[in-house]
Amino acid sequence: MAAKKSTPTDSGKSKGKKNKAQKGAGQKGAGQIVVATNRKARHDYHIIDTYECGVVLVGTEVKSLREGKASLVDAYATIDEGEVWLRGLHIPEYSMGHWTNHSPRRTRKLLLHRREIDSLMGKVRDGNNTLVPLQLYFVAGKLKVELALARGKQEYDKRQDIKRRTEEREITREMGRRIKGIQG
């Protein structure tokens, strides 16, 4: 009779090396180190969909990012000849690098599956959509970009969002006061 291999679902505990699903690699929030966020993007755009992309970097860029230096303020992505490119991302020169340093605002290639690129191409071409990076973070030692398919907000949309958030805040405050009034 052959011995049955133990799997994580058999007994709840597995012996030996952990696989990627157990380590939490590639999952948002599990072992991720955030380098930079684009806080203005959620204010200026309606986020339709998000994608996790890899980035092609040179060595000094990675070292500079590990120091926590990057700016997504003017960054955006384009699709040229079937490839996705990140433009306007500012990664300052590495402090310990000399003649080997990179250009801070160079165009960087994003890594996505072909079907995702084709889908994005269609969505960007059809409507008034754009590709905006929301966040830069490390997962299992590799830099990832959270890329959003987004549509620009008009000024009145921004005002409506601010008004809605203010009303929600007032409602939660009032509920808190009522609960305290009943208990206290």
From Swiss-Prot:
GO BP annotations listed: trans-translation
SUPFAM superfamilies referenced in this protein's UniProt entry, alphabetically: Small protein B (SmpB)
Organism per entry: Corynebacterium jeikeium (strain K411)
Region (Disordered) residue spans: 1-31
Compartmental location: Cytoplasm
Annotated family: Belongs to the SmpB family.
InterPro entries: SmpB (IPR023620), SsrA-bd_prot (IPR000037), SsrA-bd_prot_CS (IPR020081)
Gene Ontology molecular functions: RNA binding
One Pfam family it belongs to: SmpB
RNA-binding found in the keyword field: yes
Isomerase recorded as keyword: no
GO cellular component, as recorded: cytosol
Name by which UniProt lists this protein: SsrA-binding protein
Main localisation: cytoplasm
Record function comment: Required for rescue of stalled ribosomes mediated by trans-translation. Binds to transfer-messenger RNA (tmRNA), required for stable association of tmRNA with ribosomes. tmRNA and SmpB together mimic tRNA shape, replacing the anticodon stem-loop with SmpB. tmRNA is encoded by the ssrA gene; the 2 termini fold to resemble tRNA(Ala) and it encodes a 'tag peptide', a short internal open reading frame. During trans-translation Ala-aminoacylated tmRNA acts like a tRNA, entering the A-site of stalled ribosomes, displacing the stalled mRNA.
Biased composition (Polar residues): 1-11
Keywords: Cytoplasm, RNA-binding
